[in-house]
């Protein structure tokens, strides 16, 4: 059964849209829905979910008390999942893992299913062997926005943009290159795309005010060793990969900046490294959701993203170096934790000091706690 995980501090209007979509495609009996509440999530959201629960659907609103009870078996990890944070989705991931959901799908509360794409049907490729053209990009980086038609009114028409978390030193037009040769691989991660307001960084959004619509007719496998940002808006992972899919905690203060809005980006890169180590692949393309972005102050977003942009450039050697081949995701994730710790210890330069090195030591420690929790649930 599919498991969908989302966290929200809004009224949950998206929930009705997903129910109607699943009804249209005859899939309401195929999915468990985990809506992870936070301290400020309105009661209207809880009631929306519970209405479907009363109909007999396995749709769950997880109250703070529900989450505390579940995490009581993992006290060290519980202490590392902050309130008033989208990091709460980690609780839903673990619950879906406990319940045997496969695949486990992460969505954001401002992304809506679209009529032309069977949301669950397209994500059903996760865990399966597929044969598809290969996205090779340039210098082992692929720009998933090249699969979309992009309109940037201030720039006078269609342009190329790059997704949030795509390193600036790797941005070239050749990053949209796709090989004519097809390959076969098992899909560990299926990264669906988004129409409307694309997931680009605040700097791009301020300059371009871009909008997107899908322009692809076929999804792709990322080439071996090829990287691309993966967010939490519309992403499925096979259950076996969840020990490597820890949503990274944000919030450290650095030189007047705050490292934020990169938790999903770091987790997406980390699971890619682990999938490669296990011999699995990442598929990019369908399904497409509509991103109805909740109100944001773009200058605040930019302030939150600047530190991540700097750190990501420094992280390139870590992300571009394969892990040792592994038989399972937990083993790969533990090696990655060691590498993160060693990499951070050797960094210096802008933003790098004890606070940032301590932060990544904490990321590595939390990844180990995450693997241990998954193994405890097995």
Model regions: which residues?
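Short aromatic/hydrophobic "clamp" motif used to bind/position activated sugar donors
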Residues: 104
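Long, compositionally biased intrinsically disordered regions
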Residues: 284, 288, 297-378
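Catalytic-site signature of metal-activated, phosphate-bearing donor transferases
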Residues: 69-79, 118-269, 273, 277
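Acidic metal-phosphate-binding loop of nucleotide-sugar-dependent transferases
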Residues: 110-113
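Catalytic beta-strand/loop signature of glycosyltransferases that borders the donor
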Residues: 107-108, 278-289
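Carboxylate/His-rich catalytic cores and anion/metal-binding grooves
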Residues: 32-46
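N-proximal low-complexity "stem/linker" segments adjacent to membrane-targeting elements
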Residues: 1-36
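Active-site-proximal specificity loops/subdomain of glycosyltransferases
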Residues: 42-101, 115-128
């Amino acid at each position: 059964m599919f498991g969908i995980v989302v966290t929200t501090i809004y009224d949950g209007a998206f929930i009705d849209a997903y129910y109607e979509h699943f009804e249209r495609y005859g899939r309401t009996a195929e999915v468990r829905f985990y809506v992870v509440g936070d301290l400020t999530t309105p009661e209207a959201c809880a009631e929306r979910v519970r209405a479907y629960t009363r109909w007999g659907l396995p749709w769950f609103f997880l109250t703070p008390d529900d989450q505390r009870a579940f995490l009581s078996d993992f006290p060290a990890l519980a202490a590392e999942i902050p309130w008033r944070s989208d990091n709460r989705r980690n609780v839903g991931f673990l619950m879906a893992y406990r319940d045997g959901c496969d695949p486990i799908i992460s969505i954001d509360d401002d992304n809506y299913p679209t009529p032309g794409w069977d949301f669950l049907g397209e994500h059903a490729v996760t865990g399966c062997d597929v044969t598809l053209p290969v996205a090779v990009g340039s210098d082992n980086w692929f720009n998933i926005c090249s699969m979309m038609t992009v309109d940037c009114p201030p720039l006078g028409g269609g342009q190329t943009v790059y997704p949030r978390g795509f390193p600036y030193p790797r941005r070239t037009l050749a990053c949209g290159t796709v090989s004519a040769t097809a390959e076969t691989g098992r899909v560990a991660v299926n990264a669906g795309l988004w129409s409307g307001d694309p997931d680009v960084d605040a700097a791009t959004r301020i300059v371009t005010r871009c909008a997107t619509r899908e322009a692809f007719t076929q999804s792709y496998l990322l080439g071996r060793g090829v990287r691309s940002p993966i967010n939490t808006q519309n992403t499925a992972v096979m259950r076996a990969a969840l020990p490597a899919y820890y949503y990274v905690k944000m919030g450290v203060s650095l030189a007047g900046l705050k490292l934020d809005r990169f938790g999903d980006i770091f987790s997406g890169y980390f699971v890619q490294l682990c999938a490669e180590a296990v011999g699995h692949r990442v598929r990019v393309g369908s399904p497409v959701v509509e991103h109805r972005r909740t109100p944001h102050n773009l200058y605040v977003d930019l302030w939150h993203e600047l530190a991540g942009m700097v750190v990501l450039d420094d992280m390139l050697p870590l992300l571009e170096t394969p892990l040792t081949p592994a038989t399972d995701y937990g083993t790969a994730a533990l090696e990655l934790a060691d590498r993160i710790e060693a990499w951070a210890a050797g960094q210096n330069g802008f933003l790098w000091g004890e606070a940032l090195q301590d932060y990544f030591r904490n990321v590595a420690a939390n990844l180990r706690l995450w693997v241990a929790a998954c193994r405890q649930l097995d």
